[in-house]
């Protein structure tokens, strides 16, 4: 079966995440070790539609394992959501002689992989998003780096907030999921952590926590907010109006996506890239590479996207204890 796969493509789609380059590097070198050619598709699914590609060899991916972002660029494609766009992408695969595609990205990327596989193209997905919100995997490439970046920024903010005895409200990314906020909040010892999985209640989740901290003798407070829960600006305004404090609001934004990936992200990305090539070489399609209890395995994309993911309840319980909930 392996000899049937002669040429594959690799692309990154959706939001970038630290470690994507490590995954690209692994895909290229793993494929070459099997005698499989690799084509890099630039700018995600739109690049596949447009035939925007580059031939890749081992030197193409030299010295990129430590780089953030993605050397293949990334983009979102409205055209690929249409049947006409998907047909164009499938035709490009055939014109380029591709026997399969490795797609690196989030849940939107995986839905694109689902769609493309219906046109007879073998596709394997690798989860890459700082949100860690893909239902079928314990871990997504980029999460550890983003969390460490957020922690470093908040630690720096806390230094100045302590000096001025102020309250700080920090908004982190995560879209509709609170994994990043929860993890970061635990790491920085936040006064309160607001996540979209819990309905926002200012009095219970913020005001009471600040009052408790005051009783403990604290004079500065750190509120970590997931972007999908409530606006950090709104929280800041409520603190000012109802508690009489003068909070400083910081939205970390896209800085969380950048920077050199951590060792964890580099290693997991490398292992996932290797596994994706193995699955394609053995005839797999419509598959996604996932982590389960520190093991790298593959599963059906349809089954993976149908799963429901909730916050880590153990971490959530620890957070509640740490913040006095």
PLM region descriptions:
Residues 2-49:
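N-terminal phosphate-binding or glycine-rich loops at protein starts, especially the Walker A/P-loop
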Residues 13-16, 41-47, 76-77, 106-108, ...:
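Short, ordered loop/turn segments at secondary-structure junctions
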Residues 103-105, 115, 122, 143-246, ...:
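Accessory alpha-helical/coil subdomains and C-terminal extensions
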Residues 1-2, 48-101, 108-109, 141-148, ...:
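Glycine-rich oxoanion-binding loops at beta->alpha junctions
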Residues 29-56, 119-156:
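Glycine/threonine-rich beta-strand-loop-alpha-helix active-site module
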Residues 231, 239-325:
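C-terminal non-catalytic interaction/assembly regions of soluble proteins
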Residues 22-27, 108-121, 181:
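Short Gly/Thr/Asp-enriched flexible loops that form oxyanion-binding sites at enzyme active sites
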């Amino acid at each position: 079966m392996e000899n049937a796969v002669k040429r594959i493509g690799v692309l990154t789609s959706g939001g970038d995440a630290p470690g994507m380059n490590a995954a690209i590097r692994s895909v290229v070198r793993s494929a070459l070790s099997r005698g499989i050619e690799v084509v890099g598709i630039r700018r995600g699914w739109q690049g596949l539609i447009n035939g925007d590609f580059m031939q890749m060899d081992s030197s193409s991916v030299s010295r990129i394992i430590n780089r953030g972002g993605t050397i293949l660029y990334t983009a979102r494609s409205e055209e690929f959501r249409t049947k006409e766009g998907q047909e164009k992408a499938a035709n490009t695969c055939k014109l380029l002689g591709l026997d399969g595609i490795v797609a690196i990205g989030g849940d939107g990327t995986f839905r694109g992989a689902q769609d493309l596989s219906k046109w007879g193209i073998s596709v394997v997905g690798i989860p890459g998003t700082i949100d860690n919100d893909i239902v079928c995997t314990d871990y997504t490439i980029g999460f550890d780096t983003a969390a460490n970046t957020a922690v470093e920024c908040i630690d720096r903010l806390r230094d100045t907030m302590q000096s001025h005895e102020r309250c700080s409200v920090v908004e982190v990314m995560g879209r509709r999921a609170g994994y990043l906020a929860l993890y970061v909040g635990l790491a920085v010892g936040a006064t309160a952590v607001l996540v979209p999985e819990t309905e926002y209640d200012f009095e219970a989740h913020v005001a009471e926590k600040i009052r408790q901290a005051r009783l403990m003798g604290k004079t500065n407070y750190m509120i970590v907010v997931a972007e999908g829960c409530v606006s950090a600006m709104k929280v800041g305004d409520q603190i000012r109006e109802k508690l009489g404090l003068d909070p400083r609001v910081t939205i970390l934004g896209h800085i969380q996506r950048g920077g050199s990936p951590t060792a964890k992200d580099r290693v997991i990305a490398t292992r996932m890239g290797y596994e994706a090539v193995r699955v394609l070489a053995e005839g797999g399609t419509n598959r996604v590479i996932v982590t389960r209890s520190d093991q790298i395995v593959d599963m059906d994309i349809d089954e993976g996207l149908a799963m429901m993911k909730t916050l880590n309840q153990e971490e959530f319980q620890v957070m509640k204890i740490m913040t006095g909930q």
